[in-house]
Structure formats: C-alpha cells, structure tokens
Regions:
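Exposed, interaction-prone extracellular/peripheral surfaces
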Residues: 1-33, 43-51, 57-66, 72-114, ...
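Short domain-edge segments at the starts or junctions of modular domains/repeats
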Residues: 39-40
Length: 321
C-alpha cells in the first residue's frame, strides 16, 4: 500500500492544442462558444446575442460605409480537459526500499499522481486512471481502467483521494505494460479521450515503449506527457565504487551478490546509464514531447519538477492563445 500524507499544491496544465471536451471547463476549445479567447470577427446575423456585438468595430465600419453595420466577435468555448494517469507497475517500479537513502519510487509515483490529480481537479478536468498491475478486482497483466470522471463536489477532494487509492495495487505488471496501456487507450470504447486530452505516463522508462505506440497516441491528438521517475545515483548515473565491495540484489530482494568493481567498470556503468537517460530524452524530443524528470520523492522537489515543465511550455509558446 502506497499512501503519502500532506498536500502538494497544484501546477498549471498548459495544453499544446485547443481541446475538444465537455462544456464549462477551464481550457480553450477548438469549438466556438461563450469563452474569453477571441476566435475572430464576422457580420451580425439574426439570432446573435446583443452582448456579442463589438460596438467600437461596428461604429468604425459604419462610418466607413455610411450605413448601419454590426460586427460580432466569435469566441472559443471553455471546455473540460480530460486527464488520464498511466502508471507503470513493473516490479522495478517498487525500488528502492524506503529504508535506504535512495529514490523510493512508490512514494515518488504517489506524489506525482497526487499532484496531477489535484491540478486536474483545480482546472475542472475529468480524471482517469490506467495500469496493468494486480488489484482486488483484476489480475496482473489485465487493464485496470477507470474512465475519466468529474469531481462530485467542489468542497471535497474525493476524486484525488479515489485516484490515490488505485496505487494500492501490486508491482507485478508485465515489462511491456506501458506499451499495452497506450494501445489499450486507442482501442477501448468510451475512453472519453478527445483531442487535446492529457495522458501522463509515469514510469522509469528503462523499458521504452515502441515508437509506434507513442506515435499512435500522439496521432490521436492526445497530449502525451512522459513522467520519468529515476534514481539520480543508480539509474541516471552510477556511483564511483571502483575498488569497493558492494552488494547488489534482484528486484524482489531475494538474492544478493557481493561484487568488487574496478574503476573502469564503474566508469563504464556511469557512462552507460547517463547515455541511456540521454537516449530516453532524445526519443521524447524527436517525438516533440515535453517530459518531466523526477529524481526525488520529496513533494517539494516533485512540485518543482512539474512547475519547470509548465513554465517551459509557456516559454516555448506551447500554450495556445
């Protein structure tokens, strides 16, 4: 069971595209409606609301043409975005034990999930969840799918709490569970994932999904956000253990082996791990995705990582005006 106590705040969820969703949300739609962002101007037509008339523009046009002309400003609707959280539940995502001074991935994933869900609720979004781990109602390797749903009350945090309860499942998903999840979302009926929907994929990405699985999700117009959860010492790099005896165990912690690495072997592992992270980031960059790199289970650090992601989207003009 993975539970984290305390609040983590929220971050903006800047969309890359105008979305298509349910009315009365907080993001700009591709449809016209009663929002705030101006989509364009046109001549008045019978049935248009009088409040939609741009009186200054109408006065200028009327003066030029010496006749009564009325200009109406069309605006984009404000819609509810969809946010789906995909969690990698491979056994490797249970590392490292909480009593060791390294990244405890279950806590990092829990804080990421809590932050994403709370931020989605803050922006009046629908929140869904998917993983392939075992749960009381499903076995490992089967999709544990909860379609996007809305917050039932503005005075309660039940949607965030419910989403956090999904993390109580096992870390026993197959190696290809992220790929399975992306393909499942493309096939499942009634997923509710419309153009511009967020799909946050939380994983260490040591098992990268095939490019076509990621490309398929992108091709559907979804805003795929990889959340990379890796220990900065053992996975993003490797410590200088040359000449020291160190014990290494398997994922389940059942078998341990003491080895002594040379300086050269430790350096090779460091280079290998750093190149692996660089390759992961390069894959996402080539797909024009904006990943979030999480290296700590401290909620302050998790919040800072997502805040940097949101600010970078604004910096590079990701937000649609």
């Amino acid at each position: 069971m993975t539970r984290v106590a305390g609040a983590i705040g929220t971050v903006p969820l800047p969309p890359r595209l105008r979305l298509l969703g349910s009315s009365f949300g907080g993001h700009t739609s591709i449809r016209r409606g009663s929002g705030f962002d101006v989509a364009g101007s046109r001549k008045y037509e019978p049935g248009d609301h009088i409040h939609a008339i741009d009186w200054k523009a109408s006065a200028r046009l009327s003066a030029v043409r010496a006749s009564d002309e009325f200009i109406v400003r069309d605006k984009y609707a404000e819609e509810m975005p969809r946010v789906v959280i995909v969690c990698d539940r491979r056994p490797e995502m249970a590392l490292f034990p909480s009593d060791l001074p390294w990244l405890h991935k279950p806590n990092a994933v829990a804080w990421c999930t809590k932050l994403i869900a709370a931020s989605a609720v803050n922006q009046r979004a629908l929140v869904g969840y998917l993983d392939y781990g075992s749960h009381n109602t499903s076995s490992a390797g089967k999709p544990f799918w909860r379609p996007p749903s809305a917050q039932s009350s503005g005075w309660r945090s039940d949607l965030v709490e419910t989403t956090m309860e999904y993390l109580d499942g096992g870390f026993d998903a197959p190696a290809a569970n992220v790929e399975l999840a992306l393909r499942f979302l493309g096939l499942v009926r009634g997923s509710g994932l419309t153009t511009g929907s967020f799909v946050f994929v939380i994983s260490d990405f040591l098992e990268l999904p095939p490019t076509d699985a990621l490309g398929g999700a992108i091709g559907r117009g979804w805003d795929v956000v990889p959340v990379i959860v890796q220990d900065p010492i053992w996975e993003q790099s490797f410590p200088p253990l040359g000449g020291l005896a160190a014990s290494f165990g398997d994922v389940g912690g059942k078998r341990f082996l003491t080895v002594r690495l040379s300086d050269r072997e430790a350096a090779e592992l460091r280079d290998k791990h750093e190149e692996r992270l660089s390759r992961i980031l390069d894959v996402f960059t080539r797909l024009d995705l904006d990943p979030v790199l999480v290296s700590s289970a401290d909620p302050v650090d998790v919040h800072a990582a997502f805040l940097r992601w949101a600010e970078q989207r604004d910096l590079y003009g990701r937000r649609i005006a």
